[in-house]
Amino acid sequence: MSSFSSEVQRRRTFAIISHPDAGKTTLTEKLLWFGGAIQVAGEVRGRKAARHATSDWMELEKQRGISVTSSVMQFPYREHMINLLDTPGHDDFSEDTYRTLTAVDSAVMVIDSVNGVEAQTIKLLNVCRMRDTPILTFINKLDRESRAPIELLDEIESTLGMQCAPMTWPIGMGKSFRGVYHLYNDTISFFDPHAEKGTAEIIQGLDNPRLDELIGAQADDLRVDVELVRGASNAFDKQAYLDGKQTPVFFGSAINNFGVQSLLDAVVELSPPPLPRNTASRVVEPTEEKFSGFVFKIQANMDPKHRDRIAFLRICSGRFERGMKIKQVATGKTLSVNNAITFMAQDRTTMDEAYSGDIIGIPNHGTVKLGDTFTEGENLKFIGIPSFAPEYFRRARIKNPMKMKQLQIGLKQLAEEGASQLFRPLLSNDLILGAIGLLQFDVVAHRLEHEYGVDVAFENYDCATARWLRGSDADLKAIADKYGFNVALDGNEEYVYLAPNRVNLQMAQERYPDIEFLETREIF
C-alpha cells in the first residue's frame, strides 16, 4: 500500500449525536483526553468557573453551558488520525448539526441511560439514515440509577428501527455499578470513580475466582445476564454496522472516564476510513490522487480579534499541501491556499498537509459559500443534505436606523454560515429570519450585538411554515404577482412561499399545481 493510501486508511472522521444533556460534551472532552489531545478535561458543569469545555468556545456557549457551534478536533490515536466533529448539542441547533453530519463517515450516538431515546436523537439519526451512516452507540450515566439495559436496547430497536449488538454489558447500575463485561474478548473492567481512567482492574474470564472476590453475589447475576444476552441479542455483524442497519452498543460513564477508551478503540477498529462521495456527475473515491472537497460550514468571526470567516472543508480525495492552488467550481476562480488551518476548538494551527477525511479551515472574506466544491480543476459538484424548512419565524427590528447596513451585512453573513435562514418578502422591506429552534434567535441577536455592533429586536411574524418554489418562470411570476406578500427571496435568491397557516398553503398549492412546494432544498 502506498504511503498516500495508508494515510487515507488511517483516517477516522466522525461526529457525536445526542439529545441535550445526554453527556455529549463530556464524552467529547474525555475522548480528547484519552487521545492525548488535552491535558485536563474541562468540567462542563462548572459554568461559572474560568475553565469551560474545550469544544464550547463562543461566549454565549460559556454562559449557557451548551454547544451552539460546530468545531473540529484532530488528534492521533493508536497509529490512526481521528477527526472528531463536535456538533451543537442543544435541540435548537439541529440544522447546523445536519450539515455537519454530511462531512463524517460515521457517528457515535449517546443515549442517557435514565431517559433513553429522546426527540433530538431521533431527528439526528434520521439525518444519518439519509446516507446510511454507520452508528456506534454509547449508553451513558451508568453511575446513576438507570433503566434496565435490556429495556434500553429494546427501545433503541423499536424507536429507531436499528438492530442493537451489545459489545459490553453493565454490572449493576447507580450505587451498585461495578463495571462492564466485554462480550467479545471475555474480560471484565471494574469501575472505580476515583481511578484516573475510571477503571480499577481488568480480569479475564467469567469463571475467574477474582470476579467473585471483587463483587460477591453480583458475579452470579452477571453470569446469568450474559447467558441471556448471548441468547437473546444480535451478534455483531460488521457489514450490517457499515450499512447503517446495526449499532454496536457500549455502556459506561463518561463523567467518570469509564467505558470511553473502549468506545475510542471501537472507532479505530470498527468505523470505516474515508468513504466514496457522490457528485452530480460521478462518484469520487477517497484514494484518488487529485484533491477535491466541499464546504459544510461557514463560521464568521471565530476570533473577534481576527474578524474573519472560516470555511470548513471536508477533503473527499487527494492530498492538500500548503500553498497549493485549488479551483472554486461555482465561480471558476483559483485560490492559492497558504494559510489553511486545523482546530483544537479555539486554538488554530496552520496546516502543512491533509488527506481524504480531514477537515481544513480556509480563511476568507465572504467569497466562499456553504456547499462550495473545490477541486484541482475538474468541474465536480458534491451533493449532500438539504436545507430544511424553518419551524419558527421572526421579523428583525433595528433599534438604531443608522445601523441598517451593519444589520443587513450581519444577517447575510450569519445566514450564509447557517446560524439562521434569511428571507426578504417581495412586497416589503422586512428582514425575516427562519430557524429550526427558538434559541437560534438569541444566538443571532447576541452575535449581531457583539460582532457587528447592532442592537436588534425580533418580533413575532405571522408565518407557520415555508416552502421553496420550483416551477417555470411564468408560473413563478404568476404566484409572485398573486401572493406577493407571501413570496420571498432566500439568501440564494430562490423563491420561497411563507405560509401564514396550513390552509393558506394548501390553497396556494391547489391554485398552482404545476409549481412544486418543497420542504427541503439541496444546498450542495
From Swiss-Prot:
Where in or outside the cell it occurs: the entry states: Cytoplasm
Please tell me one Gene Ontology term that the record gives under cellular component.
cytosol
Keywords from UniProt, A to Z, are: Cytoplasm, GTP-binding, Nucleotide-binding, Protein biosynthesis
Q: Where is the tr-type G domain?
A: 9-275
Which GO MF term does the entry hold, naming one?
GTP binding
Give the PANTHER family listed for this entry. PEPTIDE CHAIN RELEASE FACTOR RF3
State its role: Increases the formation of ribosomal termination complexes and stimulates activities of RF-1 and RF-2. It binds guanine nucleotides and has strong preference for UGA stop codons. It may interact directly with the ribosome. The stimulation of RF-1 and RF-2 is significantly reduced by GTP and GDP, but not by GMP.
- Output this protein's name: Peptide chain release factor 3
The protein's organism comes out as: Methylobacillus flagellatus (strain ATCC 51484 / DSM 6875 / VKM B-1610 / KT)
